[in-house]
C-alpha cells in the first residue's frame, strides 16, 4: 500500500469513528496514548515493521493537526510542534510517540 492509499485509509477510519468515541480518545492524553498503543499493536500483528508504523503515526498526526482541535495541554504542545516541523521532523516526532506507547 502506498502512502496516499494509507493516508486515505487512516482518514476514512478517523472520519468513520463515532463522535463520542473520538471525543473520549482526544479529551484525555492517556486515552490517546492507549488508542495509539492499540493501533501500534494492531499494526505489529499485521506484520508492519517499525518504519511503517512510524509512517502511519505521521499520517495520523497530519490528520489530527488538520481536523481536530487540541483538547488538553499535551495535545496543544504536539500541535504546536507539528505546525513548525518539516516532514523529517514530523516523522521523528511520530517515531517518538510510537516509542512512547510501545514502552508502556
From Swiss-Prot:
Protein name: Uncharacterized protein YflH
Lineage, highest ranks first: Bacteria, Bacillati, Bacillota, Bacilli, Bacillales
Residues spanning the membrane: none
Pfam families xrefs: DUF3243 (PF11588)
InterPro entries given in the database record: DUF3243 (IPR021637), YmfJ/YflH_sf (IPR038292)
Organism: Bacillus subtilis (strain 168)
Coiled-coil stretches: none
